Structures are given as structure tokens and as C-alpha cells.
């Protein structure tokens, strides 16, 4: 059986985390040549490339499996040895989360864990359709995703759903939709998307108004909080989680443009199995709060 030296695995992990050999060397306090040598040793052991040497580097399929193994071992080591050998070093937990969860329910869910446990969070923000891929690549140990099926050697639990409403300010609604939300009016109304892969707004308009993707003018803004600000100041209409704008809807700063029509995104919590003690705490906290504030039906 091929058993890797975990120093070489840590070099591979550092290159991926730091997005390059030079910064990985600085992180590990060794030379760049030493990083390259360790990864070469690992590749010789397994007889195949473990890195695609692009900018930034990315792991091959076998590299992803090894990184996942490393992260599982680190968590299990913490469970068995952490209190005795590394009590002064907070455990690093890398999680992939979507921006809307981060802006709404996720941080309150993690609050009791952050207060009671010595951990450092590395929250990697990604669209909920792509967070599971970061878990597959071994970049994180847990992910909030819309995928309901677990990866091999992983666990999954349902968290609940975010319901997205199509909203705008009253002044925006009066300007662009004086006769209600119609197909022709939507073609003139500025909207906003998180990035070029964010298809929620387009999917909503296609499903309910038969508008083809790309037919509506759309800003690109990588911030959930900015969506709310843009809508409040009357510059765009957009899809925002109901949970994020309850106050604005109640005081009429924002209005639901299409009552009864919404987009529902069911969210699931994925993580490696077996769970360490610390990851079990994270899981319990996320499920407890998620089941409380997210839609369960």
C-alpha cells in the first residue's frame, strides 16, 4: 500500500491554498525548491501528476483525493491529540459557503461554536451550485450546497430552503412597472447578478415570463449585501432571499414585484466522513439554526 509522507501532502495543500509555489514556500518556511521536491516525491510515489501547473495551480483528480485525506487526518488528529499537543493553535476549518447564506443565517448559526471552540474559519464564498466541487477537490472540509446527493466518503443533511423574491424599491417599481411586471417592461428594467455564472434572475424570468437568458440588462456585483443596497436606492430590481429583507419589506423600503412567484433553493450540508468532534459541533450548530430559520417544507 502506498503511504504518503504527510509533509509532502502538506506541501501539496499549501500550493493549492496559497495559489502558487512561492507563497506556499513562505507559508511552510522552506525554499520554493523544497516545495517542488516534496510534490515531485509525492507524484513519483503515485506514478502520476497531482498538480495541474496552471496559474493558479489546481489538483488533479488523484490530488483531490489526497488533499481530502489530509484534511480528514488533520481533523481526526485534532480530536485525539489537539488538547494535549496543540492547545494554543486554533484548528483551521475551511468551509465552502454561498454568499446569501453568509449574509443571512450562517454566521448566527456558527456563533456558539466560535465562542466555545478554538477554531479559525476559512470561509470560501462560492455559488451554491459549485460549493460541492470545492469539497470534491479537497479544498474544504464542509460545504453548503444545493446538491442533495453526497460525494463518496461524505455525509449530507438537509438544512432548509432560502426563498428568493423578485423585489425593487417603490420608486423603481413606479418607474419601470407602472402597469405591473410585464415581459416588455422587464426588457428595460436594470437587474443585477452575483457573477457571470449566477443564473437565478435569468431562470426566474425565463420560467415566469418566457424571457431568454441574456435578454435583460444586468449589472454584475459580487456582494449579497450590495444587492439590498442597490434595490433600496432604486437602481435595480433583483432576486433577494426573503430572510435577508424582512425588515425592508415590512417598512415598504422594498416591494415584492411578483407576489406568489419566487425561487426556492434547498440547501444541504456536506462534509467528510467520519466527522471529528469539532466538525460534529459545526454540523449540530448549522442544522439546529438552519432548521429554525430556513424553510423546511
Curated annotation (Swiss-Prot):
Source superkingdom:
Bacteria
Q: Tell me, what is one Gene Ontology molecular-function annotation carried by this entry?
A: DNA-binding transcription factor activity
Q: Which Pfam families match?
A: HTH_1, LysR_substrate
User: Does Transcription regulation count among this protein's keywords?
Assistant: yes
UniProt cross-references to InterPro entries, sorted A to Z? ArgP, ArgP_gammaproteobact, LTTR, LysR_subst-bd, Tscrpt_reg_HTH_LysR, WH-like_DNA-bd_sf, WH_DNA-bd_sf
The record's annotation in Gene3D superfamilies points to:
3.40.190.290, Winged helix-like DNA-binding domain superfamily/Winged helix DNA-binding domain
Q: Which residues bind DNA?
A: 21-40
Keyword annotations: DNA-binding, Transcription, Transcription regulation
Specify the HTH lysR-type domain's residue ranges: 4-60
| CDD domains to which the protein is assigned, alphabetical | PBP2_IciA_ArgP
Q: Which family does it belong to?
A: Belongs to the LysR transcriptional regulatory family.
The record's subunit annotation is:
Homodimer.
What is the role of the protein in this entry?
A: Controls the transcription of genes involved in arginine and lysine metabolism.
- The name under which this protein is listed is HTH-type transcriptional regulator ArgP
Classification from the root reads: Bacteria, Pseudomonadati, Pseudomonadota, Gammaproteobacteria, Enterobacterales
Amino acid at each position: 500500500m502506498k503511504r504518503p509522507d504527510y509533509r509532502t501532502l502538506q506541501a501539496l495543500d499549501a500550493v493549492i491554498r496559497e495559489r502558487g509555489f512561492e507563497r506556499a514556500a513562505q507559508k511552510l518556511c522552506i525554499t520554493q525548491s523544497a516545495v517542488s521536491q516534496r510534490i515531485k516525491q509525492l507524484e513519483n510515489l503515485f506514478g502520476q501528476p497531482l498538480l495541474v501547473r496552471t496559474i493558479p495551480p489546481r489538483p488533479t483528480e488523484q490530488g483531490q483525493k489526497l488533499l481530502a485525506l489530509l484534511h480528514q487526518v488533520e481533523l481526526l488528529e485534532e480530536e485525539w491529540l489537539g488538547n494535549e499537543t496543540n492547545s494554543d493553535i486554533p484548528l483551521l476549518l475551511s468551509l465552502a459557503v454561498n454568499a446569501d447564506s453568509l449574509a443571512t443565517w450562517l454566521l448566527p448559526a456558527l456563533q456558539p461554536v466560535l465562542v466555545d471552540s478554538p477554531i479559525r474559519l476559512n470561509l470560501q464564498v462560492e455559488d451554491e451550485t459549485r460549493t460541492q466541487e470545492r469539497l470534491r477537490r479537497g479544498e474544504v472540509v464542509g460545504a453548503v450546497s444545493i446538491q442533495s446527493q453526497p460525494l463518496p466518503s461524505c455525509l449530507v443533511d438537509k438544512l432548509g430552503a432560502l426563498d428568493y423574491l423578485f423585489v425593487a424599491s417603490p420608486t423603481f417599481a413606479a418607474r419601470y412597472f407602472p402597469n405591473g411586471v410585464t415581459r416588455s417592461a422587464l426588457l428595460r428594467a436594470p437587474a443585477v447578478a452575483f457573477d457571470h455564472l449566477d443564473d437565478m434572475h435569468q431562470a426566474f424570468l425565463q420560467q415566469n415570463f418566457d424571457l431568454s437568458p441574456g435578454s435583460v440588462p444586468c449589472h454584475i456585483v459580487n456582494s449579497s449585501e450590495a444587492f439590498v443596497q442597490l434595490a433600496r436606492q432604486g437602481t435595480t430590481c433583483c432576486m433577494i432571499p426573503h430572510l435577508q429583507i424582512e425588515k425592508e419589506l415590512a417598512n415598504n423600503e422594498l416591494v415584492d414585484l411578483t407576489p406568489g412567484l419566487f425561487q426556492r433553493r434547498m440547501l444541504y450540508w456536506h462534509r467528510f466522513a467520519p466527522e471529528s468532534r469539532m466538525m460534529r459541533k459545526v454540523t449540530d450548530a448549522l442544522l439546529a439554526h438552519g432548521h429554525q430559520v430556513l424553510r423546511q417544507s
